[in-house]
């Protein structure tokens, strides 16, 4: 199994070096698809050995699928710029490379952090995400926010991706409000009446808030 690592970026200079170096430990190549960053993201990625391409942002799912098109290999490990691989995941992926795999994808546990705090409550752990997949069989769905890979034969491995989800409480609240608005818009597109949208959005916000309160305990 040869693997191409992919990362989509936009002004990710703070974390991109860590992400690229992390993927290099399991991948034969690293692809960075950048959305017109105005900082040093592309320069840092290229210096670290990544192949860098530019594509105006198409939305989360379409952008990640587009990144896979630049990959030389069928097997893709998709990593977000603010993520890195834990040692247990690196060891696991390197151990399965030499086996004939009949599955189309692998899902991994994700450790989400707010600052230095590991968020475990409100569904934030184990937070399985499918990131290693055979692009000839499956790929990212077309959602513009929080897209996912839906494999038909997925192995759920108990190893970890590290995710620096939020830098601070302020960033958490800002993103919570943004995603609540996205949820309402998507429900409206799907035909849900505004009167029915409000309780759902409140529920989404409450879930994020409860997890936030747990971090502060």
Tell me what each language-model feature is.
Residues 22, 34-42, 80:
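A conserved acidic beta->alpha catalytic loop
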Residues 136-195:
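Catalytic donor/gating beta->alpha subdomain of glycosyltransferases that bind UDP-sugars
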Residues 208-217:
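Single conserved hydrophobic/aromatic residue that forms the stacking wall/gate
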Residues 88-120:
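Conserved donor NDP-sugar-binding/catalytic core segment of glycosyltransferases
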Residues 76:
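Short aromatic/hydrophobic "clamp" motif used to bind/position activated sugar donors
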Residues 1-21:
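N-proximal low-complexity "stem/linker" segments adjacent to membrane-targeting elements
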Residues 56-71:
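Glycine-rich, basic loop-to-helix element that forms the pyrophosphate-binding segment
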Residues 17, 39-48, 88:
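Acidic helix N-cap motif at the loop->helix transition within catalytic regions
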């Amino acid at each position: 199994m040869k693997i191409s690592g992919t990362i989509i970026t936009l002004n990710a200079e703070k974390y991109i070096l860590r992400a690229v170096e992390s993927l290099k430990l399991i991948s034969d190549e690293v692809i960075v698809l950048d959305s017109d960053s105005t900082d040093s993201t592309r320069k840092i990625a290229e210096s670290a050995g990544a192949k860098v391409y530019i594509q105006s942002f198409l939305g989360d799912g379409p952008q990640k699928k587009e990144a896979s098109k630049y990959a030389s290999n069928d097997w893709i490990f998709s990593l977000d710029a603010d993520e890195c691989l834990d040692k247990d995941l690196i060891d696991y992926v390197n151990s399965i490379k030499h086996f004939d795999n009949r599955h189309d994808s692998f899902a991994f546990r994700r450790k989400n952090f707010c600052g230095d705090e590991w968020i475990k409550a409100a569904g934030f752990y184990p937070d399985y995400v499918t990131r290693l997949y055979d692009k000839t069989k499956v790929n990212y769905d077309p959602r513009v926010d929080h897209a996912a890979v839906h494999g038909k034969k997925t192995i759920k491995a108990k190893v970890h991706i590290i995710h620096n989800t939020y830098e601070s409480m302020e960033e958490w609240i800002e993103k919570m409000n943004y995603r609540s608005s996205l949820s309402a818009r998507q429900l409206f597109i799907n035909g849900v009446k505004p009167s029915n949208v409000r309780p759902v959005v409140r529920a989404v916000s409450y879930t994020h808030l409860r997890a936030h309160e747990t971090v502060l305990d």
